[in-house]
Design a protein with these regions (language model features):
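Cytosolic ends of transmembrane helices, especially the final helix of ABC transmembrane type-1 domains
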Residues: 1-14, 125
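An intracellular "coupling" helix at the cytosolic face of ABC transporter transmembrane type-1 domains
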Residues: 3, 13, 17-20, 43, ...
Length: 276
């Protein structure tokens, strides 16, 4: 009996700790993404180390925006702020004019599809890898997402279609095929915003270029933000911003100038990279 009572109180303590550490829901307003995302002089840092310094950025809905810059410049931090995983230390982020902190954060995140750098696939079917077992998603939803990701053609050619087993870590598929399935996973919930965080870095140039063309075709129905050092994702973007020393600088003119100047491109008197 004493052992059972001890286990009971240990469980109660664990539940209380989990409830205390639970993330608050944020604001009460229902989010939508119909107009634009705006960063207004947003700053963030870790301790005394500043990461973002009074960043201003406007992303119109339905456009493709690329963020470039050296490792550690704060590109992922900027995405974490947008996903409400972090909170600005000063400044604000507005979604259609509404401060992000006033929105229900869980509903806001449901509007976001996120594709990370590392491709993680289960040793299971293509269907399971797209839906991740979500009972709200059907085979029709998976097919739609795979079509959007440019993957349906190769899925149809497999012997078992959606029920095809991809192998350990997707080993039965090519790198491009694996990446398209991960993108389809992000698209399955019909996001309004798709974030690509170095999502094509492991692909060969031909596969990367094909996927970038597919991602561009998602606009204007979906807003796309891509973090990348690679030319293919930059060349298809409507706007390109370089994050350097905590500040955002817009690259104007021919995109080749980014590769001509590199990550330490000079800044003109207007705060933009000089045009060719």
């Amino acid at each position: 009996m004493a052992a059972q009572e001890s286990a009971y109180w240990a469980l109660r303590e664990a539940i209380d700790t989990a409830l205390a550490d639970a993330e608050p829901g944020g604001g009460k307003r229902v989010p939508s993404l119909q107009d634009e995302i705006v960063f207004e002089r947003v700053s963030f840092g870790y301790g005394e180390r500043p990461i973002l310094d009074a960043v201003d950025l406007t992303i119109p809905v339905g456009t493709f925006t690329s963020l470039v810059g050296p490792s550690g410049a704060g590109k992922t931090t900027l995405l974490d702020l947008l996903c409400v995983l972090l909170t600005p230390q000063s400044g604000r982020i507005r979604i259609d004019g509404v401060p992000l902190g006033e929105l229900d954060r869980r509903r806001w995140r449901r509007l976001i599809g996120y594709v990370p750098q590392e491709t993680l696939l289960l040793h299971d079917s293509i269907l399971a890898n797209v839906t991740l077992g979500d009972p709200a998603l059907t085979a029709a939803d998976a097919e739609r997402a795979l079509r959007q990701a440019g993957a349906w053609e190769f899925v149809e050619r497999t012997a078992h279609g959606l029920q095809t087993i991809v192998g350990e870590r997707g080993g039965k598929l090519s790198g491009g095929q694996r990446q398209r399935i991960v993108i389809a996973r992000a698209l399955a919930h019909r996001p309004r915003l798709l974030i690509l965080d170095e999502a094509t870095s492991a692909l060969d140039p031909e596969a990367e270029e094909a996927i970038c063309r597919t991602m561009k075709q998602l606009t204007p129905e979906i807003t796309v933000i891509a973090v990348s050092h690679r030319p293919a994702l930059i060349n298809v973007a409507d706007q390109v911003w370089r994050l350097q020393e905590g500040r955002l600088v817009r690259i104007k003119g021919p995109r080749e100038e980014y590769w001509r100047f590199g990550e330490r491109a000079p800044v003109g008197p207007d705060g933009n990279a000089p045009t060719a």
